[in-house]
Amino acid sequence: MFSAIIVLFTGSSCLKDEVIPDSFVDTRLQEYFDRFAEEAAKRQFIVDFEVLKVSGYVRLITSQNVIGQCAHDPGTPTTVIIDKSYWDNATDLEREFLVFHELGHCILNRDHLDEADLFGNCISIMTSGTAQCIINYTPATREGLIDELFMF
């Protein structure tokens, strides 16, 4: 039994050197991916993008009125794509909101939620952006909206 365990460890260490990364995260997105993982951990979720094989890119999206996408294609990493034009002009909170929204689709398998509170504000980061609710993602509302993101 002991020799079998040694063979397993030896075999896995050899394979580790040959592994090609299954995911890539654009350096511009890395901070926001890290924040998502930190916020998940605060809420007892473990998010490991390499294990989950999630990639992230900032690219030009040519579809009208689309600023972010989550692509699930069999055999390839799940991919978050953020529109470069939007990204270049967005504030830190707008970037975070969008990345968290797309990771909500890609990691948490969340659908859009377009419900509003009594004041007409969207109650979720997972709003489609085309609903009647108002996106109100500010330092004051951030924590509650992130709580909702992970409480599904």
Role assignments for model-derived ranges:
Residues F9-S13:
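C-terminal motif of bacterial Sec signal peptides marking the signal peptidase cleavage site
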Residues C14-L52, I61-A90, R110-F152:
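Metalloprotease/metallohydrolase-associated module, dominated by Zn2+-dependent proteases
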Residues E96-R110:
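Active-site recognition of the HExxH zinc-binding catalytic motif
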Residues R95-E96, S124:
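Residue-level detector of short, conserved catalytic/binding motifs and their immediate flanks
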